[in-house]
Curated annotation (Swiss-Prot):
Record-listed GTP binding positions: Q11, E69, S138, G142, T143, G144, N204, N226
Functional note: Tubulin is the major constituent of microtubules, a cylinder consisting of laterally associated linear protofilaments composed of alpha- and beta-tubulin heterodimers. Microtubules grow by the addition of GTP-tubulin dimers to the microtubule end, where a stabilizing cap forms. Below the cap, tubulin dimers are in GDP-bound state, owing to GTPase activity of alpha-tubulin. Plays a role in mechanosensory transduction (touch sensitivity). Mec-7 beta-tubulin is required for the production of 15-protofilament microtubules.
Cofactor(s) required, per the database record: Mg(2+)
Subcellular location: Cytoplasm, Cytoskeleton
Family to which the UniProt record says this protein belongs: Belongs to the tubulin family.
Protein's recorded name: Tubulin beta-1 chain
Organism: Caenorhabditis briggsae
Amino acid sequence: MREIVHIQAGQCGNQIGSKFWEVISDEHGIDPTGQYVGDSDLQLERINVYYNEAGSNKYVPRAVLVDLEPGTMDSVRSGPFGQLFRPDNYVFGQSGAGNNWAKGHYTEGAELVDNVLDVVRKEAESTDCLQGFQLTHSLGGGTGSGMGTLLISKIREEYPDRIMNTFSVVPSPKVSDTVVEPYNATLSVHQLVENTDETFCIDNEALYDICFRTLKLTTPTYGDLNHLVSATMSGVTTCLRFPGQLNADLRKLAVNMVPFPRLHFFMPGFAPLTSRSNQQYRAITVPELTQQCFDAKNMMAACDPRHGRYLTAAAIFRGRMSMKEVDEQMLNIQNKNSSYFVDWIPNNVKTAVCDIPPRGLKMSATFIGNSTAIQELFKRISEQFTAMFRRKAFLHWYTGEGMDEMEFTEAESNMNDLVSEYQQYQEAAADEDAAEAFDGE
């Protein structure tokens, strides 16, 4: 029933991915060996969305783990949930992509991609009614970005009518791991625009800010950041995994969230975000949740929704709460902030409610916004890209793997087109008076 095949590529993708499996295994009562140790039928009712039942009472994730070097894989395998995954589903090379998109997409990655597709095919064949794929990766490195996008386009060829969903970690403005991030990210976005149905943009810097300001962690680790990401991922998929009063699946989400096919880059948010020490001191209410999840401080992408307008948004509430109250609050927030929503899409906020809250919380909300403000993120990458590309800095690493400069130019202009499309719809709302006058003639 509506299965999802999960793929994690590259170091970042594997770290986020394995955290995600820890979180949802916990929610479904699956222990690190794959045995069910839960206490509620609800945990098993839709367990087959993400897990395969291998034998009596043993559940195996429908996950494919991909990397071009063995390092991260080894640490996943020796990590707490390493024995959960099917050993054949670890697919790795030995050479590494060295943060080079061309290696991931054209040379090293292309050699490994058929092995990966075999495993993906095997997973897809064991499903009843495949809903789609989700990929976790980063856009700044070599494997996640280069090989990740290669996998997407190959899977797209084979399963054109299935939803393709990515959780993409976008290079952040202040925190940079490698110099060539702008190149890798631009080349990746060029692919994502064409080949995915929904992309959740996650940004390390925004995550750092949340950890630092809201969660009061003085020195956040990648573990802390990944925990936030996995909370969001668990929230986005919660409707698929648990029964609820108002359910959504990946396709419903796409239909409601994507007004124009290219504009499918979402900003996730999560509430309640309270520091660990503060958690037990406050009961959270539906109005607070709604307020918090539209708050710019809770966004996981480093752009400010107040600088743009929401084309569409979705909120997924978890926990026992009154539907009536949820609807009232959602309406309330739209009325109060009506200037931040485009007026040419009426009722552009979708709500879903699921009865089962995440561990340790009475209720929570996950927010997904399709805001024109996301262009800030692409603009930033594009500026850095242009600065380097104008001088042809570092290009030899890419041309040496057989890439052409033309491809860079195309990717650059595709990204700039994307920015101006967002801008166009942001302004489409701004001059409706002129449009009304025009209609009135």
